[in-house]
């Protein structure tokens, strides 16, 4: 019974990929196609009811190159409607800033808890850039995209969890993705292990579709990170 209660608690928090309380997070990533590393530092707070906010700062580093600032971002979400104890409807949004300009996104999450050990979140998101880029016709326009994401959350044990996360992107205006088409996929596999009430390390394997421009190869990425909860 104790194990079952633990799984129920973990299911509720993994549905939004967070645990309640304030935390700091550090993550390092390596892209095998571009030979680029990314360093991320994040602080955040998640309430018991599921609302949360986080601030993110990243830097990138390529071989024989200097460390460069990636982006700053602030994101928040709120569980607006819970018609049943299994179904949650949650809007969210974010704004970001990088050297080329600023942008943001709005999204709507629908989460359903099928069992104590499995729940699914479907996310509809619109990504907007406040700056203009040159499109396929040589005109200046905003390279915005529509995104559909799924989060398949599995509770393996009271400490170990796994998330399968496929995302589909479609470019709204006349722009191609790095694979040479108007649409692309990004797939993430996340493995988490809860050491204790403070430490939550994780490991991610990602496929970011094929790059036909600079690298002419599949974009695979490895991420290693950890959260510390206060």
Swiss-Prot record:
Family: Belongs to the oligogalacturonate-specific porin KdgM (TC 1.B.35) family. OmpL subfamily.
Alphabetized InterPro entries for the sequence: Bact_OM_Channel_sf (IPR053713), Oligogalacturonate-sp_porin (IPR009331)
One Gene Ontology biological process: monoatomic ion transport
Pfam families for the chain: KdgM
Compartments, as annotated in UniProt: Cell outer membrane
Keyword DNA-binding: no
Main subcellular location of this protein, as a coarse class: membrane
Keywords assigned by UniProt, alphabetized: Cell outer membrane, Ion transport, Membrane, Porin, Signal, Sugar transport, Transmembrane, Transmembrane beta strand, Transport
Functional description taken from the UniProt entry: Outer membrane channel protein that allows an efficient diffusion of low-molecular-weight solutes such as small sugars and tetraglycine. However, the specific substrate recognized by the OmpL channel is unknown.
One cellular component (GO) term of this entry: cell outer membrane
Signal peptide span: 1-20
An annotated Gene Ontology molecular function: porin activity
Protein name: Porin OmpL
Membrane topology: Multi-pass membrane protein
